[in-house]
Amino acid sequence: MDFLAPLSAVVLTYREVGGDALGALAEEMRKCAEELAKATPMFVLHTCGRVEVYLYGASEEEVARVAARYRRFAEGVKVLRGAEAARHLFAVAAGLDSMLIGETDILGQLEEAYDRQVKAGYTRGLLKTVVERAVRVGKRVRTETGISRGPRGLGSLAVMYVSRMLDLREASVAVLGAGAVGAGLAMELAARGVKRLVVLNRTYEKAVEVANRVGGEARPLTEEEVEKCLAECDVVFSSVHTLQPVIKRVPPEARVKVIVDLGVPSSVVPNLPVAVVKIEDLRELAEEYNRERAGEVEKAWAIVDEEVARLPRLLARRYVEEATSAIMAQAMAAAEEEGKRAGCDTAVLAAKTTVKRTLLPLITKLKEMAENGKAEEAAKLIQLLQEALQS
């Protein structure tokens, strides 16, 4: 039994389409998840450089419908299946598919998306295992190679870019957004010794958490507070993902000299009367560091490929764990029911103990079979057990 075969991915990145289209597509995929994930496990990854949907157990028709929704926004959509889909996700987690090779922001964004979608019930079952493994692979690559030495991500590049325009040590700086990218920006700016640092976020508690970490001020992300920051700060970084711009105008006599827009779609209206740095402006700087990291890329890919090869057995074991857990729960419930018929707690305990002693050796053997490349045989035995319990 090939536990990777049911995995599918629909992928569109910064290479095929601009940021505004990616932002609109991300909103469409959010709606898609609300509709589809009730029946089919799903994981959506949206960053400034990509919108990717991973499905487990989806039919060909379901995958085709998701891809068709992508094509409303752009061509160049890739549909990946099985090991190819897993390899792509692992490479993304490792930073191998990013504009800045080895960047670490993507790993934080992946974890945030995973946590959010597990809580929502979208990412579950064996797809949950695939995404968990991707996070581990990303961490392993960064531990065992030097692919992330230097700038951590686009936020780091943006700080470097702005530092060539003015002295950040004498600057008041605001960061809009306290997610993975915003928090990374705040840490980078604090390390550079900015004069004053303000962190804004829609969830105020998150702004407080990040601000406390870097010795900055926290504010809620409202239109009024954004305008105050533009009036008071020399530089404003925006890492907010929103369909509507959060910076709509520059107030008269505002202090702001530079706005950095890392939002997808753009979080800044066009034609503002100050310098606006966009993601595209960072490409040349990214390529400079990519050349320095080129020697680590082969090592990183070797880890990715090793982990992809291990994944089927991990999924097989997880499948057996989930299935046998359900069988044990069903058998224990039946034992409890029979024990209650005897009319005493001792009978209930005895029935449960007997069931556990009987099933545990079998469950252990099934797990060993799955780990040793006999997942298909283990699955057939599990199906027989399930049928027996239902009869």
UniProtKB/Swiss-Prot annotation:
It is an enzyme of class 1 (oxidoreductase). It catalyses: (S)-4-amino-5-oxopentanoate + tRNA(Glu) + NADP(+) = L-glutamyl-tRNA(Glu) + NADPH + H(+). SUPFAM superfamilies: Glutamyl tRNA-reductase catalytic, N-terminal domain (SSF69742), NAD(P)-binding Rossmann-fold domains (SSF51735). This is Glutamyl-tRNA reductase 2. Keywords: NADP, Oxidoreductase, Porphyrin biosynthesis. Pathway: Porphyrin-containing compound metabolism; protoporphyrin-IX biosynthesis; 5-aminolevulinate from L-glutamyl-tRNA(Glu): step 1/2. During catalysis, the active site Cys acts as a nucleophile attacking the alpha-carbonyl group of tRNA-bound glutamate with the formation of a thioester intermediate between enzyme and glutamate, and the concomitant release of tRNA(Glu). The thioester intermediate is finally reduced by direct hydride transfer from NADPH, to form the product GSA. The record marks H88 as: Important for activity. Belongs to the glutamyl-tRNA reductase family. Catalyzes the NADPH-dependent reduction of glutamyl-tRNA(Glu) to glutamate 1-semialdehyde (GSA). It holds the Pfam family GlutR_N. One of its GO terms (molecular function) is NADP binding. One of its GO terms (biological process) is protoporphyrinogen IX biosynthetic process from glutamate. Its EC number is 1.2.1.70. Possesses an unusual extended V-shaped dimeric structure with each monomer consisting of three distinct domains arranged along a curved 'spinal' alpha-helix. The N-terminal catalytic domain specifically recognizes the glutamate moiety of the substrate. The second domain is the NADPH-binding domain, and the third C-terminal domain is responsible for dimerization. NCBIfam families: hemA (TIGR01035). It comes from Pyrobaculum calidifontis (strain DSM 21063 / JCM 11548 / VA1). The active site is at C48 (nucleophile). NADP(+) binds at G177, A178, G179, A180, V181, G182. InterPro entries: 4pyrrol_synth_GluRdtase (IPR000343), 4pyrrol_synth_GluRdtase_N (IPR015895), GluRdtase_CS (IPR018214), GluRdtase_N_sf (IPR036343), NAD(P)-bd_dom_sf (IPR036291), Shikm_DH/Glu-tRNA_Rdtase (IPR006151). Substrate binds at T47, C48, G49, R50, S98, E103, T104, D105, Q109. Homodimer. PANTHER family: GLUTAMYL-TRNA REDUCTASE (PTHR43013:SF1).
